[in-house]
């Protein structure tokens, strides 16, 4: 169907949860098509090759809301990069380079200092600004993700509405990146951050 000029719509019957898909775009009548991933996808396969139908509300349930915050001038904001803060070989974090690495409590460096979430909380931080956590293109999510291997801060977005797969424990599972990012957010909220 074409409800408005330049807008196309398709409805499928049945439960499509978990179905992978792409669009084929044809710009001129009789022209060849260009395959594209849905720019509004909420889940994708590894390396963002295909969109995946997922009911995020059903998957995650209701989000935990933080209590209202006082004056903005009281905010203590800490900017962090998921991989940088969790990948180090001496930080005591189990899920290195992953969203889940920022959910771990009781982590310490080899020298005995707080690390990860405990370290951030000990600073009195009220807010964190995460460097890009959306799906970006320059890291092969199925490649070598160990310390010293592929590295990028993520300023090459591909799918703005999808968490980055290299930060998930299983980048081939479209749901794990969503669920684990939510766990990261919940862990910070549990600390009042």
Predicted regions and their residues:
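Conserved, mostly hydrophobic/aromatic
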Residues: 23, 80, 120, 130, ...
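Short, acidic/polar
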Residues: 102-120
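Loop/turn elements at helix/coil->beta-strand transitions in domains of secreted/extracellular proteins
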Residues: 74-75, 123-128, 189-193
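Surface-exposed loop/turn motifs at beta-strand-loop junctions within extracellular Ig-like
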Residues: 27-29, 134, 185
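Aromatic- and acidic-residue-enriched carbohydrate-binding clefts of CAZyme catalytic domains
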Residues: 91-107, 140-190
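The feature marks proteins involved in alpha-glucan
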Residues: 3-104
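Short amphipathic alpha-helices and their capping/turn segments at secondary-structure boundaries
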Residues: 63-70, 114-126, 185
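Carboxylate/His-rich catalytic cores and anion/metal-binding grooves
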Residues: 120-149
